[in-house]
Amino acid sequence: MNINEIRKERQKWMQWKNIAPLREVIEHLGDVTCSVELGDVVTIKGKPLKNIEDTARLMMPWRKGPFEVFGTYIDSEWRSNIKYNLLRKHFNLKDRRVADIGCNNGYYLFRMQEDAPKLLVGFDPSPLFKTQFDFINRFVKSDIVYELLGVEHLEFYEDKFDTIFCLGVLYHRSDPVSMLKSLYKGLDKEGEVILDTFYIEGDEEICLSPASSYSKIPNIYFVPTISALKNWCLRAGFSSFEVLETSLTSSDEQRKTSWIEGESLEDFLDKNDNTKTVEGYPAPSRVYVRLKKGIK
């Protein structure tokens, strides 16, 4: 697989009629003197820019965040700081080569800079999310590399990684073991993956396979028990499987705001019983695990 050829082809996506005007707006922002704070809210401070809120709203929906840009608070659908803070005590990225698979607009990558990693690379084949990233990075001026690539390109990438984050991606794959193998192949020796996915309670090595959708999401294929997830990971070649955290998704973490379009968590759950999805399945819960490659 020729990664450079794929890069060239996908760069053309930035000329799509819904993306090109956004790119032009960003290019005309000019150079601005500002300061950056990488806390729960990724904050950019400085002399207010004209029409900055209008510019940011052109890039809706904002799924991950929050950000504050010259006084404009981008109240994203997900309060991504909650997940980041939950995981924060479980990793140290200093001098490590780090990838974030399905990085969206780069919120986690911006936060990870505080660890002084050797390399930060985001993978996400979404021109809109890359445009959001470029908008924020116009002011942050980070060295983060954003690739319009997916997990299937990871094993062919120029670098192998010490730590790969894969948060909220696995359940979108119809062949989860194949995806886990791709993550494995993207690691350097003794590398680690920090992964989260939906799970169901139970000791059996089984999974829920939704008929047509789960929590109104059509491309959810398998929701395993933790035991079944462990088996997938071992089959993919990982030498260890460590549960870090579990959590029930709440409306404090995911909710409607004026920065998204359409529905959010409250619309995905049964109106009379919020422990169930509208389809009658268990409400979304996540398990966070660390997988290690080990030496073979």
Curated annotation (Swiss-Prot):
InterPro entries, A to Z: CmoB, Mo5U34_MeTrfas-like, SAM-dependent_MTases_sf
Domain of life according to the entry: Bacteria
Principal EC category: transferase
Record keywords, A-Z: Transferase, tRNA processing
GO molecular function: transferase activity, transferring alkyl or aryl (other than methyl) groups
Cystine residue pairs: none
Keyword match Zinc-finger: no
GO biological process, one term: tRNA wobble uridine modification
Enzyme Commission number(s) from the entry: 2.5.1.-
Binding site for carboxy-S-adenosyl-L-methionine: 64, 78, 83, 102, 124-126, 151-152, 171, 286
SUPFAM superfamilies hit by this protein: S-adenosyl-L-methionine-dependent methyltransferases (SSF53335)
Reactions listed under catalytic activity: carboxy-S-adenosyl-L-methionine + 5-hydroxyuridine(34) in tRNA = 5-carboxymethoxyuridine(34) in tRNA + S-adenosyl-L-homocysteine + H(+)
Subunit structure, as described in the record: Homotetramer.
Role: Catalyzes carboxymethyl transfer from carboxy-S-adenosyl-L-methionine (Cx-SAM) to 5-hydroxyuridine (ho5U) to form 5-carboxymethoxyuridine (cmo5U) at position 34 in tRNAs.
Protein family per UniProt: Belongs to the class I-like SAM-binding methyltransferase superfamily. CmoB family.
Protein name as catalogued: tRNA U34 carboxymethyltransferase
Organism the protein comes from: Sulfurimonas denitrificans (strain ATCC 33889 / DSM 1251)
